């Protein structure tokens, strides 16, 4: 009869591998900003950076923003300022750092529990010692590490999508602000011409060369252009403030300058891909779709564990060493043994957890 000999070295090796896996989990020093930057670098202007976490680097970034604001802002500079200074993006990236810390916490093994007891009666004194820890947390660590990696990849892709969305919104706001400024300049010229026409009509009517009807028409044109000028000023102010909001500017910084007219259409814009190639590229490169795929993969892998984890999620393993000492003779008896705690699924069969995973 062939007997299987249990090799303690295998158990020790497996335990060491699991502990090493737990020890590898660490918080990213930059709050995963580098990972977000790698997903977005090719779609952002050259030199565009995300808000730094270091206080000294933050002060240097604010100094660069002040330097850029001294000159009329082009589109790329507006995007750079928005990425460095937008408070919403800063909060989103800070949340990503918190999620990274939660990932490390989820992969950290729970501390073992040491229980000490001392019981005395008239005949003997008993000392109880027990060391216990959660067995499920230790066994499932490799799977939980994989799941947490999927979740963090999804969170990173979502944050990268937020970065690209802010950059696109800033580009649109810059175009609208410059276009509104250009429209305001045209409205001012039209109003000046209408004022000159109304003044000429007034003088011509004074000497009898214009009728009252002709003068009234010129005055009506002047009033129409004045109303159009007021609307253009309101639109230019609103678009300017919208751009300032996206760039995170306030106070004296909102008095930044913009170009007087829109730039020419870039030559690359006339060579955009169309048809099936454009659709395939969009489906392949959209970060929000990639994030949804990772979320779907994560839910699919965790679905099978949801029910079992809800039922057997509190399995514990403990080692006990008790010493009983006879108070009369001083003789001590030592007992050693293992204990395992198994939850009994009398009330919770994991139906709610399984249903949640299926939704």
Q: In which residue ranges do the predicted regions lie?
A:
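A small-residue-enriched
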Residues: 25-47, 80-137, 240, 244-249, ...
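"Short basic amphipathic alpha-helical interaction patches in structured regions
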Residues: 95, 130-131, 143-151, 190
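Generic structural signal for well-ordered, non-membrane alpha-helices
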Residues: 73, 101, 153, 157, ...
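A ubiquitous short alpha-helical element
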Residues: 59-64, 114-119, 182-187, 262-264, ...
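Periplasmic alpha-helical coiled-coil/stalk elements that build and connect Gram-negative outer-membrane
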Residues: 25, 141, 157-281
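Amphipathic alpha-helical coiled-coil segments and their boundaries
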Residues: 75-78, 85, 92, 134, ...
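Terminal intrinsically disordered/low-complexity segments used for targeting and assembly
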Residues: 1-81, 233-281
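Amphipathic alpha-helical segments that line or abut small-molecule/effector binding pockets
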Residues: 146-153, 157, 294-297, 357
